[in-house]
Amino acid sequence: MTRFPLRAALTAGVLWGSALAGSAHAQAPNDRYWFEAQAYWPDVDTRVSVAGPNGVVGTTIDLESDLDLTDRKTLPAFMAGARIGERWSLIGEYYGLDRGGSATTSREINFDDVTYSAGATLSSSFDTKVYRAAVGYAFLKSDKGELGASLGLHVTQFKLTLSGQGHVGNAAVQSELRKRDALAPLPTLGLYGAYQIAPRVLIGGRVDYLSLKVGDYDGRLVNTEARLSYRVLDNVAIGAAYRYVDYNLNIDKERWQGELAYKFKGPALFLQAVF
């Protein structure tokens, strides 16, 4: 393959991933190992429902609007990766988002068979921890860029609590606390690309996707990132990225029956060490 078609294919792949709002896989082609620390500032939107053991359908709750959880929070993210041979690579990633708050609800809410009347003061928390691992293969590769596919596992731990004055059925109003948690291990397929547009400047992008029923979960996951980095030293790079993550899941577990729609998107700054 000539240099020009390879460059065109790489550039098209990166732009396509970025257009989807499109990474730890986006490394310079000759980097063997890398570690990255990231400060991510997402805009968060969360909707949940939890049915009770008696089959009563739960209210769809907007955690930011109904329960006043913050919709903006800076969180750390950590990534590491290694190349195996010329075309294979392994990456791992972790980040978490913990939020809590208190609000007076403006409408009646049913959560796990508990009814909280309008005007009740509710305390809540929603914590998530995300672990991502993937193996990638670069099917197009040159000295300046690469385009590849990945197979990964996106594991998310969700913990939700809600407490306040409420009642179950016809029982008297009293303080009620409900907790729910779920662990969602979701396989993903992805595309990634990177291209060195100048001696120390790299652009890159990634998109991971899932849309199927896996065990107790049925729905969709989209996880994308686009980035630009500058190599300030031979082994140190700084950069900026934009990340978009969107879960839309129906959950059918003993500890959680209901729905979860969880979306966060926003910019990030990162510092990277390469070897």
Spans of features found by a protein language model:
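Cleavable N-terminal export/targeting peptides
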Residues: M1-R32
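Short glycine/proline- and aromatic-enriched beta-strand/turn motifs that initiate or cap beta-hairpins
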Residues: H25-L97, Y131, A268-V274
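Transmembrane beta-barrel strands of outer-membrane/channel proteins
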Residues: A37-W41, G92-G96, Y137, A149-V155, ...
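Extracellular/periplasm-exposed beta-strand and loop segments of Gram-negative cell-envelope proteins
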Residues: D45-T74, G96-K129, T156-A184, L212-Y217, ...
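Outer-membrane beta-barrel architecture
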Residues: M79, A134-G136, G190-Y192, E225-R227, ...
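Repeated loop/turn-to-beta-strand initiation elements of outer-membrane beta-barrel proteins
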Residues: R87-L90, D143-G145, P199-I203, N235-I238
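Outer-membrane beta-barrel "beta-signal"
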Residues: Y230, Y262-F275
